Amino acid sequence: MELTLWTYEGPPHVGAMRIASSMKDIHYVLHAPQGDTYADLLFTMIERRGQRPPVTYTTFQARDLGGDTAELVKKNIKEAVERFKPKTLLVGESCTAELIQDQPGALAKGMGFDMPIVNLELPAYSKKENWGASETFYQLTRTLLKEKVGSSEKISPLRWKELGRRPKVNILGPSLLGFRCRDDVIEIQRILSEQGIDTNVVAPLGANPNDIERLIDAEINICLYQEIAEASCEWLKRNFGMEYTNTIPIGIKNTIEFINEVHNKLDLPLTNKKELEHKSKLPWYSKSVDSNYLTGKRVFIFGDGTHAIAAAKIAKDELGFEVVGIGTYSREMARQVRATAKELNVEALITNNYLEVEDAMKKAAPELVLGTQMERHSAKRLGIPCAVISTPMHVQDVPARYSPQMGWEGANVIFDDWVHPLMMGLEEHLIDMFKHDFEFVDGHQSHLGHTATKTKDLINSDNKKDNNPKEGIIWTESGRAELTKVPFFVRGKVKTNTEKYAILRGIPEISDETLYDAKAYFS
């Protein structure tokens, strides 16, 4: 067990809650102590839902451990079924309750309810939230479709032609507390509809048990988020012969590749690629003169596997960035992330320790960070621009407006979210660079009103920061002046390298010449 202030994923029962909360006519009875009810806040505060998750907690206390906690479980299950009248019941236990070994799933199945009961055995001390969500969706799909296994022929992707109708697909993987899932579904449905393809079921988001039973009415499955849906897609392929897509439509090239993959599987005529490229503004802007200063910018990427891999492809192939680091906290996606890292000639970082990520970020010295909410905090400490591309996220990353990551509009959103921090960074650098100019002296900073910092105070503040008495190093005025000309997002690295060079050469005072020599030494 590891004590930490912050974690990328919750325990697996939080993943199960995500699936239950995403669906209708399903209830989740969770054997857990009172303290585990904190998970409700994730949905009401972060996701900003209008209702609580469909979860009943047994909320046992210390005094209950001396008695029969199994009876407490049965009492809560009975009350939940009578009150909420679900069509399917999920039963599981939290990490604390797992130690008691009451086996609530087995207890529920022995109570004689006339409904499907899914017993969730989620190993809390070896697995995490995304695995819990994936396993819950997999067990739910398996339970509701088990009677149809072997009762029909394998499903052909060309069945729609025989039936004389438009092809149908399922969109699998979107869930609550996923990154922009709600808007991604709308965007992908729109793209599929333009291609003459109907959506049969979207699951788990917005689906009910009857919808899960209808999954086999479609020709193929769209695996939109591999962390959540890949296990279910594999099971449907093994038992019903349903093909599924592997391309994640994030970015222009991936969206075009996704459309091609769907067309190939369904044997539909392909749409002209040139027409598709004009659906988004990203390709035009990335070729324009205005964006030339973005070329070659160093970028560090960390997030869930799906979004980290997609971000790396967009950064390298569509925006001309140099990816200097990539990693994920999703151990289930480690193999794919390592393969992507190998293509980029960098080493993949697979960890759920945010301090390791911050350390790697510091060493890579990027000009832009693409990460989670935690990387935003780390980047702020390091003075590096950052855009959030993945869960875990804060409430500001769940916008009320339409803001997908996938498809054509998703590419527009991504471009704005990624490039604006760099543009603002350039603006801040120019202000910082010319802060000693006459227009920035006292009396000329009209844009700051009465809050303007006095130029003298600003210079004194910089002088204190630049000197390093611990190492016996002093920055001269010429050295400080030259250092301010370096963009702020790489200034820290330049300052550190110059001081290392000065210590190595035994130079007590750093002038502009020392800075030039250090630059030549480290080049």
Swiss-Prot record:
Protochlorophyllide reductase is composed of three subunits; ChlL, ChlN and ChlB. Forms a heterotetramer of two ChlB and two ChlN subunits. Keywords: 4Fe-4S, ATP-binding, Chlorophyll biosynthesis, Iron, Iron-sulfur, Metal-binding, Nucleotide-binding, Oxidoreductase, Photosynthesis. [4Fe-4S] cluster binds at residue 36. It comes from the Bacteria. It is an enzyme of class 1 (oxidoreductase). GO terms for molecular function: 4 iron, 4 sulfur cluster binding; ATP binding; metal ion binding; oxidoreductase activity, acting on iron-sulfur proteins as donors; oxidoreductase activity, acting on the CH-CH group of donors, iron-sulfur protein as acceptor. Its EC number is 1.3.7.7. It comes from Prochlorococcus marinus (strain MIT 9215). The gene is chlB. Component of the dark-operative protochlorophyllide reductase (DPOR) that uses Mg-ATP and reduced ferredoxin to reduce ring D of protochlorophyllide (Pchlide) to form chlorophyllide a (Chlide). This reaction is light-independent. The NB-protein (ChlN-ChlB) is the catalytic component of the complex. It catalyses: chlorophyllide a + oxidized 2[4Fe-4S]-[ferredoxin] + 2 ADP + 2 phosphate = protochlorophyllide a + reduced 2[4Fe-4S]-[ferredoxin] + 2 ATP + 2 H2O. Belongs to the ChlB/BchB/BchZ family. Pfam families: Oxidored_nitro (PF00148), PCP_red (PF08369). This is Light-independent protochlorophyllide reductase subunit B. GO terms for biological process: light-independent chlorophyll biosynthetic process; photosynthesis, dark reaction.
